[in-house]
Amino acid sequence: MTIDINAIREALPHRYPMLLVDRVLEVSEDEITAIKNVTINEPFFNGHFPQYPVMPGVLIMEALAQTAGVLELSKPENKGKLVFYAGMDKVKFKKQVVPGDQLVMTAKFVKRRGTIAVVEAKAEVDGKLAASGTLTFAIGS
């Protein structure tokens, strides 16, 4: 099942320039795969870096968090709630992400306890790992 941008906007509170998920390709109960098309028109490229544009690693992690957020906030019991970062562990950046790349982002929920969830996430470009990490979230109202 795919999820288009309209359903993503319904699930997430983020808007331009902070909405970093373009489409969901696959979704199951605890796993989601989505894409972010990276273009030279992204506002962060104006300063990171003008002569050598590279997507900031923290924004790759934010895109992964939003990917997980789409899955969690699409559930009826979480409709209208917010998801907040509670932590990031084992974050690694392996490949620069540049204009023209398509980030393929996967997030798998590995632990849930009350309003806290732990996700294993990774972002790839052309089948090569760009970034990965363990993300912890708190689901709030």
UniProtKB/Swiss-Prot annotation:
Involved in unsaturated fatty acids biosynthesis. Catalyzes the dehydration of short chain beta-hydroxyacyl-ACPs and long chain saturated and unsaturated beta-hydroxyacyl-ACPs. It is found in: Cytoplasm. Disulfide bonds: none annotated. GO terms for biological process: fatty acid biosynthetic process; lipid A biosynthetic process. It catalyses: a (3R)-hydroxyacyl-[ACP] = a (2E)-enoyl-[ACP] + H2O. Its main location: cytoplasm. InterPro entries: FabA_FabZ, FabZ, HotDog_dom_sf. Keywords: Cytoplasm, Lipid A biosynthesis, Lipid biosynthesis, Lipid metabolism, Lyase. The keyword Cytoplasm applies. Its EC number is 4.2.1.59. One of its GO terms (cellular component) is membrane. The keyword Lipid metabolism applies. The active site is at H48. GO terms for molecular function: (3R)-hydroxyacyl-[acyl-carrier-protein] dehydratase activity. This is 3-hydroxyacyl-[acyl-carrier-protein] dehydratase FabZ. It is an enzyme of class 4 (lyase). Belongs to the thioester dehydratase family. FabZ subfamily.
